[in-house]
């Protein structure tokens, strides 16, 4: 792992206040009351050190596989590769997890360490979460598979929040996210 790449510990939004307000308003479409309560709990529970019966969000790792080899990522280390399964989660297990949390957990993030969009049933997973009443379905991605047709499938499936990792601009991005090209992102 390369040790000279500085780690960005910030999270920045580059948008107008009006667009941010509209985004938040639309983000809760169809479950406004529940969403407001869910987001209030995100703030209040940690402050009061309250532990609810169920978590507010469950991360479901569809796979620890990734199609990149970013120099700062621990998933490229031999230790990680030797200790963590690099297979796709089976559909039956995914269904079982979602069935167990449906109606109890308001949000699911379909990623953890790997690139979730590589899973062959990725769009089906989003659909299943929404069908079971999960209010907010999100995922993290390196963006490598977000071609227009696939992106449309993801949106139509009901994904609520997509976080795309962009670590730098132009050459710096290409150095980190190789073999991706910044102009294509």
Question: What would you call each of these model-derived segments?
Answer:
Residues 2-161, 172-184:
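Conserved alpha-helical substructure of the radical SAM core
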Residues 164-166:
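Conserved phosphate-donor/acceptor-positioning beta-strand/loop module used by diverse small-molecule
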Residues 169:
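Conserved Motif II region of HX4D acyltransferases
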């Amino acid at each position: 792992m390369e040790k000279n790449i500085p780690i960005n510990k910030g999270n920045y939004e580059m948008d107008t206040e009006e667009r941010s307000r509209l985004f938040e308003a639309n983000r809760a479409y169809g479950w406004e009351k529940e969403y407001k309560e869910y987001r209030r709990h995100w703030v209040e529970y940690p402050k009061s050190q309250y532990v609810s019966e169920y978590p507010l969000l469950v991360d479901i790792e569809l796979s620890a596989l990734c199609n990149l080899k970013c120099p700062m990522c621990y998933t490229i280390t031999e230790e990680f590769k030797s200790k963590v399964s690099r297979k796709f989660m089976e559909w039956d297990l995914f269904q079982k997890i979602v069935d167990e949390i449906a109606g109890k957990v308001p949000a699911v993030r379909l990623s953890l360490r790997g690139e979730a969009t590589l899973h062959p049933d990725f769009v089906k997973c989003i659909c299943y979460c929404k069908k079971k009443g999960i209010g907010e379905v999100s995922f993290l991605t390196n963006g490598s598979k977000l071609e227009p047709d696939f992106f449309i499938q993801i949106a139509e499936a009901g994904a609520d929040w997509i976080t795309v990792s962009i670590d730098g601009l132009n050459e710096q991005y290409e150095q980190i996210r190789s073999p991706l090209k910044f102009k294509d992102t």
